[in-house]
């Protein structure tokens, strides 16, 4: 029985071997027979790039381009293994305690594109904020819902020792303070304490001009685009800087804010009569007359001061029209007191600024543009003082960049900020948002200056998918045709095929993104939800509701009186000046005696 079973097993083995051989032969025959069918033509990469050389980056190329960093927020928050790398997180490997982030540590701007609900905040922004806090980068973040401030305000302050400021435009009474004249006031005070400190005086004047320029450009454009009205806007800019300087010099501490500037200009528009029969004059002219001739405020207002009365009125009205946006009782609670974080503190200390903009109230959107513009321009001044770049990198995480109105000068921010260690991460839903706010030319400038592009998750009818499919380029693949007649014939040729077609982009799974960087081949990257990175949120960061504080304004008459006290004018003795005229001048036209009838 044992021998029989052994023989049976041998027969079974032989039978199995025969069946395997038959299967292999059958597969080979099917492949050969099907080779001249349409299914036999595979879109494999061939040729030498005749129709395109697009391809995905290899593993070795990815290692050379991006830095793998163990993502350990639990240890980081204890002050352990803090990363020395600063940059942008663009990918993830592993999860939880074994998560490894792919980080781009270059001085680059980033454009993040994804439809609503794709997880731009949960997959991309939160890991980047954690790395920013752990590596010590100061950052500004915009948010329409307020979730980012609530979730990361506590973490940044409690675990990483950040100065945190929440500028809540939805609830200004629950917002930190942000006096946009803070730096002007600060340096004017330093100069008034030490009149030999010309550097402080120059900085006060510089920040006054920056603030004035930012406010005048709220409505869009600059002097180059105003055409024939350029004079009025340029003169209004000088006038505004002049009043800001005077307010910083003569105003009390609680009076030096932007709403006081509005009130002063409006009061200075009024006219008075210097003498019973004299021509009425504006109080603005009276104020300027009281200043010494070498005072910078007088020089800045020179264009308006030396214009006709009608032109001067137009200039002052232009300035008032720009300041109208600040007339809001709630906004006054945020704008008319101190400043939680100014540009110098932002650059020199670990600081986080969260701007919450209300989706339901677009009238306050101008403040986002104003705050970002002013902060950026002030950072440029600090960078120039440090040899052209900042000591530590700062990040601007502009979530919903396509939702809030145009930021004047955004194109220049993308063009010039990178070399000064200012990195901008603009997060949008689709390209049409950029084109709507910045028109085609502005959109191209912004996209051309973003060296890193991350995108994924497109709506079924998205036009952005077509643009990005084209941007990925084409590869050379095999194509051909099969003719079925008496004898089957097959012709093969090379064609160009997109690296990823539009439908392939639209069907990408959630959490999968494509990363393109200047000078490298694109890569497919996976990002995970924040809790899979090991990120845990603490209690929400909330500011108490502040009671309405009384706002003080600088009075026109007080300002004129203060100027008179500080710069007393010597009364000039009226003297007649005799003008002698040579008789030769009248030889041609001799005077005639006139007879007067009485």
Annotated model-derived regions:
Residues 2-3, 464-467, 471, 520-523:
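Short intrinsically disordered, low-complexity coil segments enriched in acidic
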Residues 414-514:
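Conserved ATP-driven motor cores of ASCE-family P-loop NTPases powering translocation/secretion/packaging/pilus
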Residues 528:
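Short, surface-exposed polybasic-aromatic patches that bind anionic ligands, especially phosphate groups
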Residues 89-97, 101-422, 437-438, 503-524, ...:
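P-loop NTPase motor domains
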Residues 53-58, 77-97, 297-311, 458-462, ...:
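N-terminal short leaders/motifs
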Residues 1-118, 122-130, 135, 173, ...:
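Basic- and hydrophobic-enriched, low-structure N-terminal and domain-boundary segments
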């Amino acid at each position: 029985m044992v021998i029989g079973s052994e023989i049976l097993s041998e027969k079974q083995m032989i039978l199995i071997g025969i069946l395997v051989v038959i299967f292999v032969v059958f597969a080979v025959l099917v492949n050969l027979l099907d080779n001249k069918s349409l299914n036999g033509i595979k879109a494999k990469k061939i040729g030498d790039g005749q129709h395109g050389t697009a391809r995905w980056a290899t593993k070795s190329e990815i290692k050379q381009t991006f830095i793998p960093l163990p993502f350990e927020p639990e240890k980081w928050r204890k002050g352990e293994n803090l990363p020395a790398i600063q940059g942008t997180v663009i990918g993830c490997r592993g999860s939880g305690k074994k998560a490894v982030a792919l980080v781009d540590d270059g001085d680059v701007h980033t454009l993040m594109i994804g439809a609503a609900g794709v997880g731009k905040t949960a997959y991309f922004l939160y890991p980047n904020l954690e790395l920013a806090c752990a590596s010590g980068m100061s950052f500004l973040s915009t948010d329409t819902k307020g979730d980012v401030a609530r979730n990361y305000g506590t973490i940044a302050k409690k675990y990483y020792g950040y100065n945190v400021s929440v500028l809540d435009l939805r609830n200004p009474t629950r917002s930190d303070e942000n006096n946009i004249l803070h730096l002007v006031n600060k340096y004017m005070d330093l100069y008034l304490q030490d009149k030999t400190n010309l550097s402080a005086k120059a900085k006060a004047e510089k920040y006054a001009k920056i603030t004035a320029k930012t406010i005048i450009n709220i409505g869009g454009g600059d002097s180059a685009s105003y055409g024939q009205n350029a004079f009025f806007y340029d003169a209004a800019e000088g006038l505004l800087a002049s009043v800001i300087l005077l307010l910083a010099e003569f105003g009390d501490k609680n009076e030096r804010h932007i709403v006081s500037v509005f009130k002063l200009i409006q009061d200075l528009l009024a006219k008075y009569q210097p003498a019973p029969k004299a021509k009425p004059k504006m109080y603005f002219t009276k104020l300027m007359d009281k200043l010494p001739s070498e005072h910078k405020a007088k020089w800045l207002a020179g264009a308006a001061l030396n214009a006709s009365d009608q032109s001067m009125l137009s200039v002052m009205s232009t300035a008032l029209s720009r300041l109208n946006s600040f007339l809001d009782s709630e906004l006054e609670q945020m704008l008319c007191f101190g400043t939680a974080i100014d540009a110098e503190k932002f650059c020199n200390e670990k600081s986080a600024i969260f701007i919450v903009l209300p989706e339901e109230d677009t009238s306050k959107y101008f403040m986002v543009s104003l705050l970002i513009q002013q902060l950026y321009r002030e950072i440029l001044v600090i960078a120039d003082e440090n040899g052209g770049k900042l000591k530590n990198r700062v990040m601007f995480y502009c979530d919903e960049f396509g939702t809030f109105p145009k930021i004047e000068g955004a194109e220049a921010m993308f063009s010039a900020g990178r070399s000064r260690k200012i990195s901008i991460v603009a997060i949008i839903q689709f390209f049409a948002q950029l084109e709507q706010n910045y028109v085609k030319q502005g959109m191209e400038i912004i996209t051309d200056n973003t060296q890193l592009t991350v995108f994924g998750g497109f709506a079924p009818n998205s036009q952005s998918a077509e643009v990005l499919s084209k941007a990925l380029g084409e590869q050379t693949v095999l194509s051909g045709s099969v003719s079925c007649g008496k004898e089957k014939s097959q012709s093969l040729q090379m064609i160009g095929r997109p690296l990823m077609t539009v439908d392939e982009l639209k069907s990408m799974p959630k959490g999968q993104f494509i990363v393109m960087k200047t000078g490298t081949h694109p890569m497919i990257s996976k990002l995970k939800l924040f809790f899979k990175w090991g990120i845990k949120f603490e209690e929400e960061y909330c500011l108490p509701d502040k009671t309405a504080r009384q706002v003080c304004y600088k009075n026109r008459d007080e300002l004129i009186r203060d100027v008179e006290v500080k710069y007393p004018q010597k009364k000039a003795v009226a003297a007649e000046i005799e003008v002698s005229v040579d008789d030769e001048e009248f030889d041609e036209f001799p005077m005639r005696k006139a007879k007067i009838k009485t």
